[in-house]
Amino acid sequence: GRQDLQQKILRTVGDAPARYQEDALRMYRACRFVGQLGFDYVQRQGAGPAFGQPQTPYYMPQSYSFPVSRSAGLSLERVRTELDKLLLGKWAGKGLMLMMATGLAAGRCRVREQGTYREIDVLPELEHLAGLPQNQRFHCYDVWEHTLAAVDNSPRQLAIRWALLLHDVAKGLPGIRRLNKEGQPSDHGHEAESAVMAEVILSRLRYPAPFVQRVVWLVSRHMRFAPMLVTGERTLLRWLRSEAAGGNFKDSHEMTAAFEQLVAVFLADMGATHAGKNTELMAEG
């Protein structure tokens, strides 16, 4: 144990599958501890092939599988608590990568309604993002690892981190993914569908309505700032007036707080791209 701590390794005591059979929440806690501590997860049994893009911060030279079906017996409240703690971790991207690599993102949990339990999905909508290519003129990561880098770039505020986790969730889907005239992948308009999906996901996970509304607003507008770096101040002012009149905010203080979060989302998103270092590329993308 002491040697593992010195080497920043996280592993279960004894047989990993047995520990997860005893308490399925340990699977989520493993991801959360990786996200909080930045340790590398290893287990003695069941090592699989590498996962992720080589030579990126999120690459896993070995992957592992969790007994994901066991998570179906966990309450939503316990799972959501672990997700929130993971997202607020200093190394959240690394913990999320473990969650994806082990199949846990596609897990299920249960909610109680009118005296009976039913199963619900956790985050299967994220699965298709792993390995999903992007236009390399603008992007240095695939969609999933871009998402992880954007999360890690951001302030540790829950609404901001959920917004960044879900900001590109619609990329690659039919009707969104196309090829441009150079034959490169393009996901024009993905922000609108990502916002729709974010509302479905967060409502399913039973986050409070004001929180859901804020995250959805951030996702739906995360592409708005980039063109304004070229079009200028007048366009920005027209947009601000439109948002003020749109009924999304109860007062100017709430609107100011929302725009501060949106700036953080924009900067974190752009910081995880090539375009973030090039204003012309940013406006074009």
Language model segments and positions:
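Glycine- and charge-enriched loop/helix tracts that form the active or gating conduit
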Residues: 1-157, 161-165, 169-189, 193-209
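Histidine/acidic-rich helix-loop-helix segments that form or flank divalent-metal centers
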Residues: 2, 132, 137-139, 151-152, ...
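Residue-level signal for secondary-structure boundary elements
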Residues: 13, 17, 39-42, 91-95, ...
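Polar low-complexity intrinsically disordered regions enriched in Ser/Thr and small residues
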Residues: 49-51, 55, 235, 249, ...
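A glycine-rich phosphate-binding loop feature that marks nucleotide/adenosyl-phosphate handling sites
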Residues: 101-104, 113-118, 168, 214-222, ...
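Conserved alpha/beta core segments of nucleic-acid transaction machinery
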Residues: 125-133, 276-285
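Short, low-complexity, polar/charged sequence segments that are solvent-exposed and flexible
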Residues: 182-184, 237-240, 284-285
